């Protein structure tokens, strides 16, 4: 297993890279989120990797963060989601955005990704529910699902509301609202529905 590559970036052609590591050039496919953060050609680069072995090829996928790689690994476990589709998902939205879409059960956000239809989006929501942990949903420097929103969601579920109802109510709560105030506002939104 090749878990990490450190070398010189020789070639960039989205989504493909060529990284020279002590005279050996590794072809690596990366999500666009990683691609946009790469250094210039000729500069050193370090990527976390995932090797996929198929009958006809050995494919190497690279990631700029452990959260991206972990999410990729979770995605390829899902029936009907191969490495290319997983790469498309990670290119279409950041890990925190994906975690938020999963937490709030927003299939519509997933269907905006090329190649993801309604059924695939619903399968992603079902299979990834509870699997994108705090380290994935709260990558430093990126917007994520606030802890308070997750707590409000859990409180509404504990009160017997469906996930769909709870997610819709949470959308009515302004970002940055505390848990107790968030629950009050969500319950108010639910009473009007």
Curated annotation (Swiss-Prot):
Localization of this protein: Cytoplasm
InterPro entries associated with the record: DNA_helicase_Holl-junc_RuvA_I, Hlx-hairpin-Hlx_DNA-bd_motif, NA-bd_OB-fold, RuvA, RuvA_2-like, RuvA_C, RuvA_C_sf
Keywords for the protein's UniProt record, in alphabetical order: Cytoplasm, DNA damage, DNA recombination, DNA repair, DNA-binding
GO annotations of cellular component type: cytoplasm; Holliday junction helicase complex; Holliday junction resolvase complex
Keyword DNA damage: yes
Region of interest (Domain III), residue spans: 151-193
GO molecular function: ATP binding; four-way junction DNA binding; four-way junction helicase activity
Region Domain I, annotated ranges: 1-64
GO biological process, one term: DNA repair
Region called Flexible linker, residue ranges: 144-151
Gene3D superfamilies tied to this protein: 5' to 3' exonuclease, C-terminal subdomain, DNA helicase RuvA subunit, C-terminal domain, Nucleic acid-binding proteins
Stretches for region Domain II: 65-143
NCBIfam families: ruvA
Task of the protein: The RuvA-RuvB-RuvC complex processes Holliday junction (HJ) DNA during genetic recombination and DNA repair, while the RuvA-RuvB complex plays an important role in the rescue of blocked DNA replication forks via replication fork reversal (RFR). RuvA specifically binds to HJ cruciform DNA, conferring on it an open structure. The RuvB hexamer acts as an ATP-dependent pump, pulling dsDNA into and through the RuvAB complex. HJ branch migration allows RuvC to scan DNA until it finds its consensus sequence, where it cleaves and resolves the cruciform DNA.
Family: Belongs to the RuvA family.
Domain comment quoted from the record: Has three domains with a flexible linker between the domains II and III and assumes an 'L' shape. Domain III is highly mobile and contacts RuvB.
Description of how the protein assembles with itself and partners: Homotetramer. Forms an RuvA(8)-RuvB(12)-Holliday junction (HJ) complex. HJ DNA is sandwiched between 2 RuvA tetramers; dsDNA enters through RuvA and exits via RuvB. An RuvB hexamer assembles on each DNA strand where it exits the tetramer. Each RuvB hexamer is contacted by two RuvA subunits (via domain III) on 2 adjacent RuvB subunits; this complex drives branch migration. In the full resolvosome a probable DNA-RuvA(4)-RuvB(12)-RuvC(2) complex forms which resolves the HJ.
Protein name: Holliday junction branch migration complex subunit RuvA
């Amino acid at each position: 297993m090749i878990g990490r590559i450190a070398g010189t970036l020789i070639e960039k052609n989205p989504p493909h890279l060529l990284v020279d590591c002590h005279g050996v050039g590794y072809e690596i496919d990366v999500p666009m989120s990683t691609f946009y953060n790469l250094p210039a050609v000729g500069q050193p680069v370090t990527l976390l990797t995932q090797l996929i072995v198929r009958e006809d090829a050995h494919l190497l996928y690279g990631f700029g963060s452990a959260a991206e790689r972990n999410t990729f690994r979770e995605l390829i476990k899902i029936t009907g989601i191969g490495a290319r589709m997983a790469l498309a998902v990670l290119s279409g939205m950041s890990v925190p955005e994906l975690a938020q879409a999963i937490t709030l059960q927003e299939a519509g956000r997933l269907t905006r990704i090329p190649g993801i239809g309604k059924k695939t989006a619903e399968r992603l929501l079902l299979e990834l529910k509870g699997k994108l942990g705090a380290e994935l949903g709260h990558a430093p420097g990126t917007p994520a699902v606030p802890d308070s929103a997750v707590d409000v969601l859990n409180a509404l579920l504990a009160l017997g509301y469906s996930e769909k109802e709870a997610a819709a109510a949470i959308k009515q709560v302004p970002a940055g609202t505390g848990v107790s105030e968030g629950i009050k506002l969500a319950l108010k939104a639910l009473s009007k529905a």
